[in-house]
């Protein structure tokens, strides 16, 4: 397992599940909505078993959408950092160009409402 602390904060536990299910982490494997490797039902059942907390799929969906927006804003920030010359690494350019993926993902969510 990998523990990523850069966005650590107190909040709704459903946010963590939503972040894992954000489209950006599927890396093209859209048939597997959980990080590109699993299904919602399996994630929710495993989470409930391990935590003793009930999963609210609608709250997770909210966090999936907000996670996509949040990642899109971060991608735009990285693109700006690259374009301004403050960080000309290939990593900044590559992540920055992913902002458009989030725009498409958010439009798909809006169409599904």
List each model region and its residues.
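Regulatory N- and C-terminal appendages and interdomain linkers associated
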Residues: 84-113
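Short amphipathic alpha-helical segments and their helix-coil junctions
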Residues: 2-5, 38-56, 99-106, 110
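All-alpha amphipathic helical-bundle segments outside canonical DNA-binding/catalytic cores
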Residues: 54-66
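Short, conserved loop/turn and helix-capping segments at secondary-structure boundaries
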Residues: 11, 34-37, 93-96
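Active-site acidic catalytic loop and adjacent metal/ATP-binding pocket
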Residues: 1-15, 19
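Short, surface-exposed loop/turn segments at secondary-structure junctions
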Residues: 30-31, 57-59, 85-91
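Active-site activation/catalytic loop segments of kinase-like enzymes and analogous catalytic loops
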Residues: 14-52, 66-84
């Amino acid at each position: 397992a990998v523990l990523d602390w850069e966005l650590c904060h107190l909040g709704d536990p459903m946010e963590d599940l939503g972040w894992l299910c954000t489209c950006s982490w599927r890396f093209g494997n859209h048939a597997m909505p959980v990080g590109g490797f699993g299904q919602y039902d399996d994630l929710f059942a495993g989470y409930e078993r391990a935590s003793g907390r009930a999963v609210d799929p609608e709250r997770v969906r909210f966090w999936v959408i907000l996670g996509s927006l949040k990642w899109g804003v971060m991608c735009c920030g990285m693109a700006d950092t690259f374009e301004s010359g403050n960080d000309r690494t290939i990593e900044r350019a590559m992540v920055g160009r992913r902002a458009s993926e989030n725009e498409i993902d958010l439009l798909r969510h809006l169409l599904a409402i």
